[in-house]
């Protein structure tokens, strides 16, 4: 299939059924969850499934997901419920293991609050499925600064945090803290999740750095990040602190040869 856009012909892959799954961690996302699930599963040219990892949301997020699973989103949406807030990193690791067990070839990370535009999912998929990259990153900083409705202080903190990570680790990625990604199956199969150190913001850095050190090909795909309109942000100062000091540990791990492929 060919798509004509901005005077360039772009090849778009046609996915096989059950080829890709989008992992969406949730905690108190009742305002967003139905809309985001319908937006992802409603992409006409691509059959993305969705896995929601809910950390015991007291607002009833999981109940909404179950209602949709019992209705018209049956077989497209899946749910893993956990007891309490166990951290973003452990949520994604649980999702990765589930995706591998269910034989998906492409596995995505995505926020529930529309900060990541579902319409960009095919572009990330295309980078891996057609162009041959192993990890595609929805990047806010590959072509300038593409962030909407963030306070300037937060924009600067995020931007320079990514620069700091790149400087310390040497990873050739502009948006090192991005949370909108597509992994090929083989990347996740090569990572030893038992040795992943971080649970919060630094988890996003660690997964990219690990993939890079294991020799996988990475592409940044420019996206526009839009701050959430509904619900409450889960970011905190502690999360940034983990990222700040965590990159030094990652650098040391690389220097001492601790980052190795998972043993079969």
List each model region and its residues:
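Hydrophobic helical membrane-anchoring modules
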Residues: 2-18, 170, 194-264
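Short, well-formed alpha-helical segments that are part of the catalytic scaffolds
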Residues: 29-42
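Donor nucleotide-sugar binding loop of glycosyltransferases
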Residues: 29-32, 57, 117
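Short helix-capping segments at alpha-helix termini
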Residues: 43-46, 69-76, 103
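Short beta-strand/loop segment that forms part of the nucleotide-sugar
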Residues: 47-57, 80-81, 110
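Acceptor/aglycone-binding surface of glycosyltransferases and processive sugar-polymer synthases
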Residues: 82-101, 106, 118-201, 228-245
